[in-house]
Design a protein with these regions (language model features):
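N-terminal accessory/targeting segments that precede structured cores
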Residues: 1-137, 147, 173-197
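Short, solvent-exposed loop/turn segments that connect beta-strands within catalytic domains
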Residues: 146-154
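Glycine-rich ATP phosphate-binding loop
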Residues: 155-160
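A conserved alpha-helical element in kinase catalytic cores
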Residues: 163-186, 205-226
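Non-catalytic, low-complexity flexible loops and terminal extensions
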Residues: 191-210
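Conserved small/polar residues in nucleotide/adenosyl-binding loops
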Residues: 228-235
């Protein structure tokens, strides 16, 4: 990886951990320290405003950084069992479409993975994605004649990872593990959730999502399941 690439990843790590630490310090000061000094009611009155402000800051951070941070925000927006509506409502905007990566960068990434020019693998390939997500995006394409004859079909959807996403996932998870370690030392948070365990589960599913061979295998297994039928009971003769 180039020196600028390393600098971007280091900056990314610092921004994520700085945000995490700032939220932890805010919780420590307003929800632990001030209530012990007789200012519990004053602290409580400002809680909604603080939560909303923190959610807005995270949404902006996730939108700017992209990658796994978008998925973190999408995941948190569904946790209405753990987070107040001020947070989940703000983060729900991250469920919308994600801006697509530049096709020139995607082409380089795809050709490196395939080991051949895209023009050799495909008779045609759209340059505008039909879907863009935090970790990858998809394009309509037609297989080259020889490959189409071998496969038995020509029209395909090509799913390509965002350039450099594997390194981004590694860095983001490293930052999230650091933050989870800090949160595990905050008693009332640790009593409510095993944050390090949640991060590890999130890491497992994230790595599965960027393992397209694993995904292809799962798609094959799902397709094979549809080849079978099960007995259908008839109530009138039962």
């Amino acid at each position: 990886m180039s020196a600028p690439g390393h600098r971007r990843l280091r900056s990314r790590y610092r921004r994520i951990t700085f945000f995490g630490m700032s939220v932890i310090l805010q919780v420590w000061w307003f929800d632990i320290v001030l209530p012990r000094t007789g200012l519990r009611e004053w602290s409580r009155r400002g809680q909604t405003r603080r939560l909303t402000r923190s959610a807005v800051r995270f949404r902006r951070l996730a939108t700017d950084l992209g990658g796994l941070m978008i998925k973190v925000g999408q995941f948190l927006s569904t946790r209405i069992d753990m987070l107040p509506p001020q947070v989940t409502d703000e983060l729900a905007t991250l469920q919308d479409s994600v801006p697509a990566a530049d096709f020139a960068e995607v082409r380089v990434c795809a050709e490196e993975e395939l080991g051949m020019p895209l023009s050799r693998a495909f008779a045609s390939l759209g340059t505008e994605p039909i879907a863009a997500a935090s970790l990858g995006q998809a394009y309509r394409a037609r297989l080259a004649p020889a490959l189409a004859a071998e496969a038995g079909f020509a029209d395909v959807v090509v799913k390509v990872q965002r350039p450099g996403i594997a390194d981004v996932v590694d860095v983001d998870l490293s930052a999230l593990r650091r933050i989870a370690g800090w949160l595990s030392r905050v008693p009332f948070i640790a009593q409510r959730a095993d944050v390090p365990a949640l991060v590890e589960e999130f890491a497992r599913t994230s790595y599965e999502e960027i393992d397209y061979l694993h995904e292809a295998g799962e798609a094959d297994r799902f397709r094979n399941c549809l080849l079978y039928t099960s007995p259908s009971p008839r109530d009138s003769t039962s």
